[in-house]
Design a protein with these regions (language model features):
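Short active-site segment of divalent metal-dependent hydrolases/proteases
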Residues: 23, 199-200
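Acidic, low-complexity terminal tails and accessory targeting/binding regions
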Residues: 2-14, 90-101, 147-189, 202-246
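Short beta-strand scaffold positions
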Residues: 62-63, 132, 194-195
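Phosphate-handling substructures
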Residues: 75-136
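Generic beta-sheet signal
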Residues: 15-16, 81, 187-198
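Conserved histidine-centered catalytic loops in small-molecule metabolism enzymes
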Residues: 8, 53-86, 111, 205-208, ...
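Generic structural signal for well-ordered alpha-helical scaffold segments
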Residues: 48-52, 131, 135-146
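Active-site-proximal alpha-helix that buttresses catalytic centers in soluble enzyme cores
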Residues: 13, 18-79
Length: 246
């Protein structure tokens, strides 16, 4: 009986995980971490042209970096971005804002390549510490949403909002929408996280139902994922993950 009472007040939250648009450093294939640069003009135009793909969201959460805030303001102009500290990209240390050509021949860079990216960046961040930072602050964001809802329990479920011109995807998302619509006592919230490639990779490696390596979750600039997310017994799992390509 207690479970039935609790289930009546579940709050449904759907999420986007979106990587920021292209920056000058991204164009030149540089390691852009702590460098706080904005979007290129071409990226701004591309995002403006494609923002109809995204459903209206209730909240937008970003890192503190210009490139994420600018992307959020273009895609979701009706929402003020909420900055969540700790969702920033990796600190690349001495590799920061340099590209392969500039680093080629550097013994420290070669050692990092030979380690398959597992070594800490010289004078920068360790990969495992970075992953922990991103995941912890993702959870911190969800906890703020839970508290703001005034409910004791949040269940993250089916994502129905991807307006993509793909018949197969449309059928899948429509089915999920019908499933959620039938639960008429659910309160549905849609949250967009506009962050960095490494941040998204960290979150999905940790919480995706489909287990993949960190590097298998790479995402292009301006693209991202939608997910249906369950939050039960203190454990978060991201399900039904679909890639969004602009």
């Amino acid at each position: 009986m207690k479970k039935e009472k609790t289930d009546k007040f579940k709050k449904y939250i759907n999420i986007y995980l979106i990587r920021h648009g292209m920056t000058p450093g991204n164009q030149e294939h540089r390691y852009v971490g702590r460098t706080d640069e904005g979007l290129t003009q071409a990226a701004r135009k591309e995002l403006e042209d494609r923002r109809e793909i995204f459903q209206k969201v209730d909240r937008v959460i970003t890192s503190s970096m210009k490139r994420c805030i600018q992307t959020a303001e273009i895609l979701f102009p009706y929402q003020v971005p909420e900055i969540q500290p700790g969702l920033e990209e990796m600190d690349f240390g001495t590799f920061e804002y340099r590209n392969y050509q500039e680093l080629s021949g550097d013994p420290k860079y070669q050692a990092w390549i030979d380690s398959n990216g597992t070594l800490p960046f010289p004078a920068g961040e360790d990969l495992q510490q970075f992953k922990h930072r991103c995941c912890q602050n993702f959870l911190n964001s969800l906890e703020k949403i839970r508290k703001a809802s005034g409910k004791d329990e949040i269940t993250f479920r089916g994502f129905s909002s991807l307006h993509h011109h793909n018949e197969e995807n449309d059928k899948e998302t429509s089915a999920v929408f019908e499933q959620n619509k039938n639960d008429n006592e659910a309160v549905k919230t849609c949250v967009a996280f506009v962050v960095h490639g490494g941040t998204i990779m960290s979150i999905l490696e940790a919480f995706a139902e489909e287990k993949k390596n960190y590097y298998d979750w790479q995402v292009k600039n301006g693209c991202g994922y939608v997910a249906s997310t369950d939050y039960e017994n203190g454990a978060i799992v991201l399900r039904n993950i679909k890639y969004i390509e602009l």
